[in-house]
Amino acid sequence: MNGNMMGWDLTIPQAISHAEKYNYDGKLISRELDGSIKETTYGESIKRSKKLANALSKLGINLHDRVATIAWNNSRHFETYFGVSGMGAVLHTLNPRYSPAQLVYILNHAEDKVLIIDPTFIPLVEGVQEQLNFVETIIIAAEKSSIPDNSLNNSCSYDDLLEQESIEYQWPDLSEDTSSALCYTSGTTGNPKGVLYSHRSTILHAISIAGTMGFESSSAVLPVVPMFHVNAWGVPYSALINGFTLVLPGHALDGESLYELVQKESVDCLLGVPTVWLGLLQYLEGKGLKMESVNQVLVGGSAAPYAMIKAFDEQHDAFLTHGWGMTEMSPLGTINTQTKKAMSLPTEERYQLQTKQGYPMFGVEIKTVDDKNEELPRDGEASGALKVKGPWIMHTYYKADEPAVDDEGWFDTGDVATIHPDGCMQIVDRAKDVIKTGGEWISSIDLENAALTHENILEACVVGVPHPKWDERPLLFLITKDGNEIEKQEINDFLLEKVVKWWLPDDIIFVKELPHGATGKLLKVDLREKYKEHLMEK
């Protein structure tokens, strides 16, 4: 016997309509391209989203058509989120740090008909426009007067386009299974793969993260995680639904600019990758400043080191919350929130707990399996391939012939993890980053975190490279705080207090910078390729 409840599709137009009625005065703060800080409301942004929907309709955009963006976290990009998906088209956010060849591949694979870009990215698009097979119109997200001379074909000003349109627009009735957005994976091996989200998955994820992260209507949230990466972790959608203040940092992600926004808007929650927070902490420490309003810093993309967790707590009274997920998961899967258990622990034990990736949100199931696909015990010791399933987790890559899940519906994340008896999940490493040496495993993440507890180490990266006897051995790359090299023996002696001897790196290489992707993740594949003969030559 079925229940007698109403059927009601979970769609982005429903979220927009809700915000128009109840969250219209919610604040949207945005740093614009000229550096100015703009304040508007969700009500005003929705009016402009309706204008955009009207304009796109006149440009021939219909249900399911793809509209791409290459843009920073700003007010126009926010309007695009809802104008595109709200009309039933597919919002395709593009990572501007893809190589030109990858951009061409992705735009052609997605068959984007319209491309909306910030003026910053005009040179990037000029270099590839002749290779784009489907893009008919390029919209530059600025006033016409501020757009530099360029050679783009069939281009127009975003503001001029909207100026001609009416704010009257009737959002369509969509099935919740209609596609809403498209995001491509990082593509470190082979071509990037497309992940096509639905309205249902997007809304369910947005509702869930608000409760899990503790967002309230009185919150002020600053996502440094880019809007071109997995929908900025779903925060823009959650903001519209819940009405909290959304603070968008634009292109200025330096410590001074972020601190200015935090202070001016009394931001209480920050979201981003560890490399961004490393720069912010350095700036604040150098200036002797404290973030008075921030109480939570959500970290994802890569593991936050113990030293960062400690610094946010001791210097800013802010709790660093680890989250974990991936593009295929919309992205959030687990989160290590401020539970009563965590807050009751002695400080040092709490910091250690905070280094873990946390507990699955409702809607996400996790398990680890061995090489025979047998589920491993949740004992905090056994580690194996991490698999997931849930309503906002991908089943099949965009345009792929075969599902990406196994026969039981589980998706293999490519991570190696351990699950503790209380359900807390800890990433041991990416499967491709685990160092296999003499039949044993070394976690590059654990070795990096051990190095980062040294008082003069700013950033660390560990990769496995071929070894003539042991298959692979670790190389440790370091950036020091003072820019000077440290005696390698000192580093090894320091590490030996934290790891077993056979984990010690075969070489330590001091560098001025490490390669990062657009989302802040270390590009270990670049280092592995560059140094693949390093130990073979010794």
Task: Tell where the protein language model's regions lie, with residue ranges.
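AMP-binding/adenylate-forming catalytic core of the ANL superfamily
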Residues: 98, 115-117, 390, 396, ...
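Conserved AMP-binding A3 loop
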Residues: 39-43, 180-204
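Conserved AMP-binding/adenylation subdomain of ANL enzymes
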Residues: 203-220, 228-269, 283-284
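Conserved beta-loop-beta connector loops within the AMP-binding
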Residues: 360-387, 421-422, 484-488, 523
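Conserved pre-ATP/AMP-binding loop-to-beta segment of ANL
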Residues: 9, 24-26, 139-140, 155-156, ...
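Conserved AMP-binding/adenylate-forming core of the ANL superfamily
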Residues: 28-74, 78-82, 99-104, 157-160
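Structural core segment of the AMP-binding/adenylate-forming
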Residues: 15-17, 58-59, 86-160, 482-484, ...
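Gly/Ser/Thr-rich phosphate-binding loop
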Residues: 267-272, 282-352, 365, 372, ...
